[in-house]
Amino acid sequence: MNHYEFVQTDSIHFLKEWPKDEKIDVVFVDDWHSYPHVKKQLELLDQLVGPSSIILLHDLMYGNTDPFYHADLSHAGPQWDEGGPYRAVAELNPQFWEWSTLPWNNRLTILRKKYSNKYHRR
């Protein structure tokens, strides 16, 4: 009996194909880092996670060894366009999302959707 499945594929396609009635417990996002791409991933994940799900994102503090978020990474190339993954996460509504970043090795962010009677069924 498998309790996990490792899948290596295009993330947008994968998330679009995932059954909406099957919640994802843990997902690790370390993909193309442009703002539009990460924003789309988070929009799709919004439908697939609940308050007990965890989304792990890599590289929100990418760019140097200091533990600071970077919204402008135009110097880093097109993969970081328009603010990169930090901007996509920073724009999430804090009423419905909470997150924290561990400041080591380009940083690991833990993102969780908060429970809301308005938007979630138990």
Task: Show the residue positions of the predicted features.
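S-adenosylmethionine/decaboxylated-SAM
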Residues: 1-122
